[in-house]
Amino acid sequence: MSRKASENVEYTLRSLSSLMGERRRKQPEPDAASAAGECSLLAAAESSTSLQSAGAGGGGVGDLERAARRQFQQDETPAFVYVVAVFSALGGFLFGYDTGVVSGAMLLLKRQLSLDALWQELLVSSTVGAAAVSALAGGALNGVFGRRAAILLASALFTAGSAVLAAANNKETLLAGRLVVGLGIGIASMTVPVYIAEVSPPNLRGRLVTINTLFITGGQFFASVVDGAFSYLQKDGWRYMLGLAAVPAVIQFFGFLFLPESPRWLIQKGQTQKARRILSQMRGNQTIDEEYDSIKNNIEEEEKEVGSAGPVICRMLSYPPTRRALIVGCGLQMFQQLSGINTIMYYSATILQMSGVEDDRLAIWLASVTAFTNFIFTLVGVWLVEKVGRRKLTFGSLAGTTVALIILALGFVLSAQVSPRITFKPIAPSGQNATCTRYSYCNECMLDPDCGFCYKMNKSTVIDSSCVPVNKASTNEAAWGRCENETKFKTEDIFWAYNFCPTPYSWTALLGLILYLVFFAPGMGPMPWTVNSEIYPLWARSTGNACSSGINWIFNVLVSLTFLHTAEYLTYYGAFFLYAGFAAVGLLFIYGCLPETKGKKLEEIESLFDNRLCTCGTSDSDEGRYIEYIRVKGSNYHLSDNDASDVE
C-alpha cells in the first residue's frame, strides 16, 4: 500500500474512533441499534487494518469507505419524506388516470356522440398536445415560482378540466375539457419527478422517484376499473369516468398548501435559512451540514463556470456536459413513446376489439387486466431500481418490450391469415356508397373505417358474410342491407362487426399486451423520468426536465394521433412491427449513451457527462474522478470511488 493510502486509512480510522467515542459519551447505555452500528464500523476498521498490514494495495480503503457509507446511509429516514413523496405522486396518479380513462370512455363516447376516427384521435391526442405545450412552459414556471406552486397549479387544472368533462354535452366541450386536463398533466409530468428527487436522500432517491411512476400506472389501473364499473351505464357512464379525477386533484391541492418548497430551489433563490430548516425536517436525525454546503457550493460554482447571461436552454446547449445530458434525457423520453406504450394504454380496449373481442364491456374489463399488469410490474421496478441500477434495468426492459411487440404483431398476422372470406356481395341501393362491397376478406373490410362486417354463424363457421358501409349516425348498424336495423337483425341471428373480425386468435392480442407491459413497466416506464430528474445540475434541472418532458409529449402526440391511420395503411401487425423497429434502435442508444447514476448525489452526477457522449455508458472508467466528503457525526473524512492514491 502506498504511503498516501496508508495515511488516508489512518485518518479515516481516527475519524471513526472519534465518532464512537462521541457516541459513548452521549449515550452511556447504547441501544441495540447503536451497538450494531459500532460493531459494523469496527468490523470494517479491523478488516481494513488487516488488509493494510498485508499490503493489499488500495482495496482496504475502498472496503472501509463502502462500509462507512452503508452505515451512515442507514440512519432513519423521517416519515415526512414519504408523506411528501406520496402527495407529490398524486400528480402522477392524475396523469395516469386521465390518460387511461379515455380507453374505456371512448367505446361509449363514439356510439353516443357518433365519433369518427378523426374525432377519436383528437380527443386522445388533444390532451397529449396540451401536455407537450405546458411541459415545455413548465420549466420557466418552475424556475420562477418554484416546484410547489407548479404542483398547486397542476392540481387546479386537473379539477377544472374534470368538471368540464363531466358536464360536457357535445364533442367540442369534451375537446375543451381534455385540453385543460392536458395542461395539468404536462406541468405535473415535469415537476413531480424533479420535486421528489430534490427532497429525497441519495440512497432512496431512485425508489421515491419511481413511486411517481407507480402512481401513474396505479391511476391507469384505477381508471380501467372505473371504466368497467360504469360501462353498464350506456348513457352517462362516461361522465362519471371522466369526472372522478377531480377527487384526487382536490386532495393534492389542499395537501400541498401545507407542504414545503424544494430546499435546493430555495438555496438557488437565496432563501438559505428556510432551506436549512426544510432540509433538516427532511433528514430527521441526520446531519445536514455537508449536504447543505455541497448544494450551496455547487450552485455557486455552476454560476461562475456557466455564467448567467442568456436563456438557460442556450447555456445548456453551449456547455458540453449539460448538452450531453439533454441528449440522453430527451432520447430516453423519445424512445419510451416510439416503443408504443401510450398506443397500448390509450387504445388497449380498441386493440382488443380489433383482435376479435366483440363485446364492449368485455373489452373494457380485459383492458383493466393489462392496466393491472402495468401497475404490478411497476412495483417490481420500485424494488429493482436501487438493486440493479438504472442502466441495466432500462436496457433489459426495452429488450423484452421489443420481443413482446413482435409477438403482438404475429398475433395479428395469425388473425389476418384466418380472416373470413366475404361470400355475399349485395347490390348497393341507388346513390349509396358501394366501395365496401369491393373487399374480398373481413380483414380488408375492417381496415376501412367506413365499412363494417355483416354475417351469420353456422356453429363456429362464418357464413353469408358481406362488407357494407357503416351508418354514420351509429356504428352499431350498417347504412343499408341486412344489418341496417339493429333491433331487427339481432332477432334474425345476423351479426354485425365494426372494428373487428371473428377469429379464434383473439387471445394472442391479450397475451401480447400483457407480455409487453411485464417488460415495459419495471424499466422503460419509470426510468426515463427517474434519470431525467437526476442528470441535470440545479441551474438546468427545470429547463432540462421541461425539454425532455416536452419531447415525451410531442412523440406521444405523434404516436397516438397516427395509430388508427397507421393501422389502416400498414395493417394492425404492420403498426406493431414498426414500433418494434423503433424499440430496437432505442436499445442501441441506451447501450451506447446511458450512464449509471445509482447511489450518486445529484451534485456528483454532472461529472458522468464530462466525456464523449457515446462512451458514457461505460461509467466504470477512471475518467471523471470525483471526491466526496461526508460528515461522520461531527468528523469529516473523504470518500472516493477511486483508489486513495489518486487523491491529493
Swiss-Prot record:
GO biological process: myo-inositol transport; positive regulation of amyloid-beta formation; transmembrane transport; transport across blood-brain barrier
UniProt cross-references to Gene3D superfamilies, sorted A to Z: MFS general substrate transporter like domains (1.20.1250.20)
NCBIfam families, per database record: SP
Transmembrane segments: 77-97, 126-146, 149-169, 179-199, 213-233, 240-260, 325-345, 364-384, 394-414, 509-529, 550-570, 574-594
Protein's UniProt name: Proton myo-inositol cotransporter
Known function: H(+)-myo-inositol cotransporter. Can also transport related stereoisomers.
Changes after translation: Glycosylated.
Family membership noted in the UniProt record: Belongs to the major facilitator superfamily. Sugar transporter (TC 2.A.1.1) family.
One GO location term (cellular component): cell projection
UniProt KW keywords: Cell membrane, Glycoprotein, Membrane, Phosphoprotein, Transmembrane, Transmembrane helix, Transport
Upregulating conditions: Induced by hyperosmotic stress.
One Pfam assignment: Sugar_tr
Main location: membrane
Disulfide pattern: none
Topology class, membrane: Multi-pass membrane protein
Residue positions the entry lists as glycosylated: 433, 458, 485
